[in-house]
Amino acid sequence: MSQSLYLVSNKVKIGVVRNPFERAVTEYHNSLNYIGFDEWLQANPMQLQKEMYKDMDVLIRLEDWEHELEELELPVKDTSILEKLFIAPMWNNWYTLKTRTSVADLYKEDILTFGYSL
């Protein structure tokens, strides 16, 4: 299931957003479901990250977290949660036209808000 991922630095709340296309494959992989990815997407909608992180002061992208934290010049003491996080390898190979369209429709707000694409 979807879970919030955040860091705290000097009382600044930093939300870490994920590419919705990568996130969907990772959540499918972690679910140990034996139905196909197409069916799983429809049966298991993820919560929009836009809503999950609405109380955060800053949002950074998971795939570039080290660089983004460096640019913010915020000392974060513990990044082990980010270092241990599973990211589905070759996640973009999972997509067909149908699944790409499904994720794009289901998570349109996150894709537009955070500037993601497949």
Predicted feature locations:
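Membrane-interface amphipathic segments in extracytoplasmic regions
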Residues: M1-L118
